[in-house]
Amino acid sequence: MDRNKTNYLWGGDKPGRTLTLGLQHVFAMFGSTVLVPALTGLNPSVTLLCMGIGTLIFHLVTKGVVPAFMGSSFSFITAICAVMTKYGGNASYVGWGIMASGVLYLILSGAVKLFGVKRITEFFPPVVTGCMIIIIGMMLAPTAMNNVTTVRGDVPQGATVVVTQGDPAADPFVFCEYHYDADHPDSFVSGWLPAENLALKADAEADETNGLAAYTNPGNAYTVLKAGGVSMLSEASESSPTVSGTMRWKYWVVAIFTIIVIVLVMFFVRGFFKLIPILIGIVAGYLLSIALGLVDFTAVREASWFTLPKFSFFAAGPIDWSAVVFAITMIAPISIVTFVEHVGDITANGAVTGHNYLEEPGLHRTLLGCGLATIFSGMMGGPAATTYSENTGVLAATKNYNPATLRFAALFAIILAFVGKVSGVLQSIPAPVMGGVSVILFGMISSVGLRMLVENKVDFTRSYNLIIAGIMLVFGLGLSSGITVGSVTVSGTAIAAVLGIILSKILPKKDADERREEAAQKATAGK
């Protein structure tokens, strides 16, 4: 084999050592990489495949010199969840938003190449990027708590449901209410169900079904042909077929236990295990869930050892262009934040290895690699890709900076994508386990935003920073559902980002009092 090809494959290291260290990088990235699809409803196997191939694309573009792994970006979780919820779990619309994010990376890559790094980052002062990260984390808070407090279950075959959002004749998924108790029709389960599993009930039949006439027109009542679809309990009732009071305290116990385990690992564990507190927390919460009878192994039993990932291609089926616009405006603006994060990640990576990757191979190349990886992932139905700080931590801990170990980690990820049992196990993880993990992760996202403000010494005694932060936070959090103009909905995240950038450019850096005080000081100094 050609010597240069051998060095690219093994990085000049022994094959056995490179493979072992590559496997360690898999453990470092695995928990976070599969957590994003677990929290958003995307397919875990598709995610692993996309991140593996995305990492190889990144290494090809960056000349194979940057020891980085492309993992699932947490910054996009809120936006992905919003799109998935609005359009009944249709991941193909998410793909449009993810691809738009990748295209934005390509544009930023060209801009960096043309104008230089400093000219581009001037549009994103710390007060804007810090507040954007805080907004992202805070918008995720309801998702975290819903995983803890909401008991989920399947609507049984033969049940009558009321379609409250969507058209079963046109949409793949519709939002339904299942009024399971005729004596208490205000207690119901609601959630997204596949339209193909529903059959329209006759008007007379619908009128007499569990008091539905008081809540809907008969034409909205349907019969469930096949059990399935995750449903969310809106109001607790002991008569509910999916919940009991005992079940609810078990959910809280599992969530709190998961949080405690993660905190203990982060503070008191040393060595390799300190790098994977999230994965350890998930395993611990999963084991407790098994003991409490909360785990359904059906997905594990039915999964084959070898399986093809279930792709959600962006152009599959009829396209609702208003949904595409919503997905793009909801997801793509987050690239503004992740662009700054990318610069920080590459800088941190270089600080660990002793190389300035912003200069060689250049920030424009790392952005290009990240953008192409994200576009590929969006096309297949995966999440946005980002350079993982978890793997930078492994580099620092092992002091082995061989980029080839990351390429082998990518190959391991690709192989795992075709192991069906892995996807089955991930699908069987109970909601309270992910809820406990989410409390930690989503809170930390907002904390990172606060840290950015502190590290950059953003002075909140100045009106400039107060106004920008205040307006961004109120619009970003207050318009969490976005603004709808006609058939197009623009996300609150996008609105906050645009307002922050505009205000940072048009507002004077100092108000009248500050300018007067500065002038007085200059006058005094001149005497």
Q: Where are the regions that the model predicts?
A:
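Interfacial segments of multi-pass membrane proteins
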Residues: 80-87, 266, 391-406, 412-416
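Membrane-embedded helical hairpins/re-entrant loop segments and their flanking transmembrane helices
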Residues: 3, 7-16, 38-59, 330-403
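N-terminal alpha-helical transmembrane segments of multi-pass membrane transport
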Residues: 1-67, 134, 173, 510-517, ...
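Membrane-embedded alpha-helical modules
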Residues: 88-162, 218-221, 225-298, 410-518
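Membrane-interface helix-loop-helix modules in multi-pass membrane proteins
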Residues: 65-100
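Short, non-helical or kinked segments that cap or interrupt transmembrane helices
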Residues: 42-47, 64-77, 120-129, 274-279, ...
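Boundary regions of SH3-family modules and the immediately adjacent low-complexity/disordered segments
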Residues: 177-233
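Hydrophobic, membrane-embedded alpha-helices of multi-pass small-molecule transporters
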Residues: 16-32, 246-259, 276-277, 312-345, ...
